[in-house]
């Protein structure tokens, strides 16, 4: 099956997608991962993305869509995939439907107080980007990444003022996309507030009969 995961910052889209991918054999495709891979491989699109990223710009819709188009053409997604971080606009959602129609858009719903608690406690590896949390996913050694031994830092956009701005911006951005999938009967809401193991269980129960 083909899924799109929607949800505000801190909803746990990437964490849930990773868990589902490991348990169900569905490929997890993240926009960030696609961009990093393109830059690392120095493809034509990768070089274009690198120039934008180096000056702190935002990669345009067309470029991101082309990268997604290329990724979902690989053989490993034949049995299904979970898209995390795409689409971010209705234009991208329409393009995705033309490329490969999805089965469900899963909207992960989490109360604001829970989102804030999650985001303010997040720590990210400055070298490889791995994510940790001071309460829920602590590294083996405080302040040091388990994977690459890089230094863990608080991202600027994980500070309180930035978090509140991000949540406001997300709502404005997400409403049209949620409406887009709702109109097509593809929208499913999932409670993302409980522990991840419970959210995974609910996901599996919800979609077991759809396979």
Curated annotation (Swiss-Prot):
This protein's domain notes: Consists of three domains, a large central CORE domain and two small peripheral domains, NMPbind and LID, which undergo movements during catalysis. The LID domain closes over the site of phosphoryl transfer upon ATP binding. Assembling and dissambling the active center during each catalytic cycle provides an effective means to prevent ATP hydrolysis. Some bacteria have evolved a zinc-coordinating structure that stabilizes the LID domain.
InterPro entries given in the database record: Adenyl_kin_sub, Adenylat/UMP-CMP_kin, Adenylat_kinase_CS, Adenylate_kinase_lid-dom, P-loop_NTPase
PANTHER family with a match to the protein in the record: NUCLEOTIDE KINASE
The species this protein was found in: Treponema pallidum (strain Nichols)
Binding site residues for ATP: 10-15, 122, 131-132, 194
LID: region residues: 121-158
Binding site for AMP: 31, 36, 57-59, 85-88, 92, 155, 166
Function: Catalyzes the reversible transfer of the terminal phosphate group between ATP and AMP. Plays an important role in cellular energy homeostasis and in adenine nucleotide metabolism.
Biological process terms in GO annotation: AMP salvage
Region (NMP): 30-59
UniProtKB keywords: ATP-binding, Cytoplasm, Kinase, Metal-binding, Nucleotide biosynthesis, Nucleotide-binding, Transferase, Zinc
Family: Belongs to the adenylate kinase family.
Catalysed conversion reaction: AMP + ATP = 2 ADP
Enzyme class of the recorded protein, top EC level: transferase
Keyword Ribonucleoprotein: no
Signal peptide start and end residues: none
Residues annotated to bind Zn(2+): 125, 128, 145, 148
Cellular component aspect of the GO annotation: cytoplasm
Pathway: Purine metabolism; AMP biosynthesis via salvage pathway; AMP from ADP: step 1/1
Protein name, entry field: Adenylate kinase
Keyword Coiled coil appears in the UniProt entry: no
The protein's Enzyme Commission number: 2.7.4.3
GO terms for MF: adenylate kinase activity; ATP binding; zinc ion binding
């Amino acid at each position: 099956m083909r899924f799109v995961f929607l949800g505000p910052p801190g909803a746990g889209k990437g964490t849930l997608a990773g868990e589902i991918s490991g348990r169900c054999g569905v490929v997890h495709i993240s926009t960030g991962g696609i961009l990093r891979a393109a830059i690392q491989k120095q493809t034509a699109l990768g070089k274009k993305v690198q120039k934008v990223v180096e000056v702190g710009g935002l990669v345009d819709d067309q470029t991101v869509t082309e990268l997604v188009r290329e990724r979902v053409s690989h053989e490993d997604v034949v049995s299904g995939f979970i898209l995390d971080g795409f689409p971010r606009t209705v234009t991208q959602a329409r393009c995705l439907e033309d490329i490969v129609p999805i089965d469900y858009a899963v909207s992960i719903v989490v109360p604001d107080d829970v989102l804030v608690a999650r985001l303010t406690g997040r720590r990210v590896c400055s070298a490889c980007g791995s994510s940790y949390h001071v309460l829920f996913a602590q590294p083996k050694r405080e302040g040091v990444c388990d994977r690459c031994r890089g230094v863990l830092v608080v991202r600027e956009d994980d500070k309180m003022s930035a978090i509140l701005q991000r949540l406001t911006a997300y709502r404005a951005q997400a409403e049209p996309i949620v409406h887009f999938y709702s109109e097509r009967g593809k929208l499913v809401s999932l409670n993302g507030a409980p522990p991840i193991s419970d959210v995974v269980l609910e996901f599996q129960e919800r979609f077991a009969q759809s396979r």
